[in-house]
């Protein structure tokens, strides 16, 4: 692997050194990454960025970063905060610039060229990062400042940055002997490539390798007209005019599972979904998973930890895997009986309809929808006309406006990476510029599944001037069809509010230092996002944005009451499938080398251990668990539930005040939990807002588990 890495690097260098100096200078001047953007608000000039620009920018970015590090280590003066920590904190500007654009676009609008570049550059970046984190001279300077941090006259934030960097270097192998560092380098390089492979395989399995094509209209029985229309359009775009096509993207999959009366076809598409990455083909992820689990276990041992879970969670609010497992066990004990009750109620419906079968996992959505209608007289298709994407978007903007006084102005003249993307300027109450927000709503073959929030430029400071953030929300919502706008179901509505919470976190965060500005423990990260979901379903808020897309009629109270009454609907299923996935994640990362051989057998044993009922699969099975194998959540998928305790407690604080838009609480939450969130430990910052540690009771009540 090391030799191939050198060959790749040599080939890249030859490409550029083979040009005459004049030609190279001309090429450099044409590369948008090689100078500060001249676009409005410093947004990436997507209209000028070509795929050919990425590799040269990565190579030059690493070269410049190396020079910046050398300037620090070659400094003959004694280490100070300014000549070591601050210099390091500000280094790597070009590399960061190209990395943010490349990896964000590769997730949201990829192609074969981008994927090949990712495979080339990932090992180079792994080596580059290891060269820095294992740089003995750099670590010596940081260590010297760390050891004198209490007597140097530095302020609290400077001390915190020093402590963070010192801990980072320790956790990345700076204290290891040379032979152990070489082992760690090899592991990091392999893990970076395996993660790329996992994501590429999953993208192909989800977007290319399965389609359910229907040519008999009778097989569409039960499906809403909007779903049928969308399926016809999908088929037409794929060259199957006159037929109907369903895919594994959630806007296509979930409605089919909810409404299609053809049970055999429900099973077929569901199996297509839960067998992703497990089909013994070129995109099979079983060996990728096994190798990643083994390598992570080896990495943890090298760094002095019993397992990768201990290594990861040590930096989180939970502190230890035992605390996480205890937390998950308590919730599973509460959730399993609720799920079993839901299953019994659905089986009763099926039996009364003359079913001669025991419900299976592919039946859950179909009979859950029937149960919702029976218990709450609530039909999701009755709701969707009130939740057009535009109205939901404007609703979340209005909530942020009432809480924080900010406004969102749509812009049409900024370059974007895809024509579907919308752009907004975000302003403070006084009219000053706060940041830019991109919104990318719809599925496409070039986009990964799910929803996420990222940034093209983080908030910070440069040359004593504030750098304003550029935030992006990426989703996979049901697209518009014909004259019908994009209509969201309740899950999609909650998802948009969720990702918007992340966006607000990115917009509001401030700090002098890159290492601490907005950087919080992983099990705190979902607090800003999940707390926003609470506002989406409040009656006062629903009346602000839930309006019929045809008539403009505000959602009637009868429907609001149904939404409120059905708040506990399907909570057993939702909680059990999530907890099961979290347990699977932790179990993988509690392993010691040589870890596992048979991924599927291990998965079955893990689920049997917690008593998972056969009708529910974990939310993500091993071979498509992108969060932990391609998303930075290894040994950390539990964090959504951990943060749910915080978000339920935080919103309960607003409710107790008698005003969900309480301005004093909103100001305190913004300052302590969003703007200054990286200034201290996560719980310390939360307690500054709440006045006490969070209680588990609001979450249990919210989810019907108490």
Whereabouts are the PLM-identified features?
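C-terminal, non-catalytic "cap/extension" segments appended to globular domains
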Residues: 24-49, 60, 243-245, 374, ...
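C-terminal motif of bacterial Sec signal peptides marking the signal peptidase cleavage site
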Residues: 15-18
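Active-site-proximal, well-structured secondary-structure segments within enzyme catalytic domains
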Residues: 157, 161, 200, 204-247, ...
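Short, hydrophobic/amphipathic alpha-helical patches that form generic packing surfaces
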Residues: 94-104, 163, 167, 271, ...
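N-terminal helix-rich structural modules
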Residues: 25-223, 245
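Short pre-active-site segment immediately N-terminal to the catalytic Zn-binding motif
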Residues: 478-497
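Sec-dependent signal peptide recognition
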Residues: 2-9
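Short His/Asp/Glu-rich catalytic/ion-coordination signatures at enzyme active sites or charged loops
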Residues: 38-53, 102-121, 144-186, 247-287, ...
């Amino acid at each position: 692997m090391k030799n191939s890495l050198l060959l790749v690097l040599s080939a890249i260098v030859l490409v550029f050194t083979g040009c005459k100096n004049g030609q190279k200078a001309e090429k450099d001047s044409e590369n948008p990454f090689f100078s500060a953007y001249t676009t409005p608000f410093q947004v990436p000039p997507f209209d000028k960025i070509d795929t050919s620009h990425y590799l040269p920018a990565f190579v030059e970015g690493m070269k410049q970063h190396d020079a910046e590090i050398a300037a620090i280590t070659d400094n003959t003066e004694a280490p100070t905060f300014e000549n070591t920590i601050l210099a390091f904190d500000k280094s790597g500007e070009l590399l960061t610039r190209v990395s943010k654009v490349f990896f964000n676009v590769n997730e949201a609008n990829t192609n074969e060229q981008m994927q090949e570049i990712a495979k080339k550059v990932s090992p180079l970046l792994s080596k580059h990062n290891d060269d820095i984190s294992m740089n003995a001279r750099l670590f010596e300077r940081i260590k010297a400042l760390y050891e004198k941090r209490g007597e140097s006259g530095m302020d609290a934030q400077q001390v915190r940055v020093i402590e963070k960097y010192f801990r980072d270097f320790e956790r990345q192998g700076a204290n290891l002997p040379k032979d152990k560092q070489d082992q760690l380098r090899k592991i990091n390089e392999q893990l970076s490539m395996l993660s790329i492979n996992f994501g590429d395989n999953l993208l192909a399995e989800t977007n290319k390798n399965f389609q359910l094509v229907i040519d008999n209209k009778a097989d569409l029985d039960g499906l809403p007209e909007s779903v049928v229309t969308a399926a016809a359009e999908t088929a037409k775009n794929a060259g199957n005019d006159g037929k109907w096509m369903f895919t594994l993207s959630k806007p296509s999959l979930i409605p089919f599972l909810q409404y299609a009366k053809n049970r055999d076809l429900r099973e077929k598409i569901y199996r297509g979904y839960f067998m992703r990455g497990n089909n013994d083909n070129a995109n099979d992820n079983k060996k990728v998973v096994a190798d990643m689990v083994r390598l992570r276990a080896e990495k943890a041992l090298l760094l002095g930890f019993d397992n990768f879970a201990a290594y990861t969670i040590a930096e989180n609010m939970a502190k230890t895997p035992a605390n996480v497992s205890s937390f998950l066990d308590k919730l599973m004990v509460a959730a399993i009986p609720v799920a079993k009750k839901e299953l019994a109620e659905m089986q009763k419906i099926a039996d009364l309809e003359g079913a001669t079968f025991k419900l299976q996992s592919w039946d859950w959505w179909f009979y859950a929808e029937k149960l919702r209608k029976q218990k709450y007289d609530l039909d999701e298709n009755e709701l969707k006309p009130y939740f057009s994407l535009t109205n939901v978007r404007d609703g979340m903007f209005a909530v942020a406006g009432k809480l924080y006084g900010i406004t969102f102005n749509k812009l049409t003249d900024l370059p974007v990476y895809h024509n579907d993307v919308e752009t907004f300027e975000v302003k403070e109450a006084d009219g000053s510029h706060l940041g830019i927000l991109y919104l990318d709503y719809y599925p496409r073959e070039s986009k990964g599944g799910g929803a996420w929030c990222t940034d093209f430029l983080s908030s910070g400071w440069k040359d004593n001037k504030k750098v304003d953030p550029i935030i992006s929300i990426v989703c996979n919502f049901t697209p518009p069809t014909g004259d019908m706008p994009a209509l969201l179901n309740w899950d999609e509505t909650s998802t948009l509010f969720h990702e918007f919470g992340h966006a607000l976190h990115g917009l509001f965060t401030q700090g002098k230092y890159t290492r601490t500005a907005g950087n919080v423990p992983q099990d705190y990260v979902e607090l800003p996002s999940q707390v926003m979901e609470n506002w989406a379903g409040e009656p006062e808020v629903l009346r602000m944005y839930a309006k019929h897309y045809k008539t403009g009629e505000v959602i009637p109270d009868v429907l609001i009451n149904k939404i409120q009454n059905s708040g506990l609907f399907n909570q057993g299923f939702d909680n059990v499938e999530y907890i099961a996935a979290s347990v699977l994640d932790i179990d993988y990362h509690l392993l010691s080398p040589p870890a596992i051989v048979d991924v599927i057998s291990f998965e079955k044993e893990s689920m049997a251990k917690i008593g998972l009922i056969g009708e529910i699969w974990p939310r993500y099975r091993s071979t498509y668990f992108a969060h932990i194998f391609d998303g930075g959540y290894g040994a950390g998928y539990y964090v959504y539930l951990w943060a749910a305790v915080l978000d339920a407690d935080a919103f309960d604080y607003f409710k107790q005040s008698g005003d969900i838009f309480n301005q004093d609480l909103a100001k305190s939450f913004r300052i302590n939990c969003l703007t200054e969130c990286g200034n201290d430990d996560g719980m310390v910052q939360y307690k500054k807002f709440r006045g006490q540690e969070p209680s588990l009771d609001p979450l249990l009540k919210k989810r019907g588990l108490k």
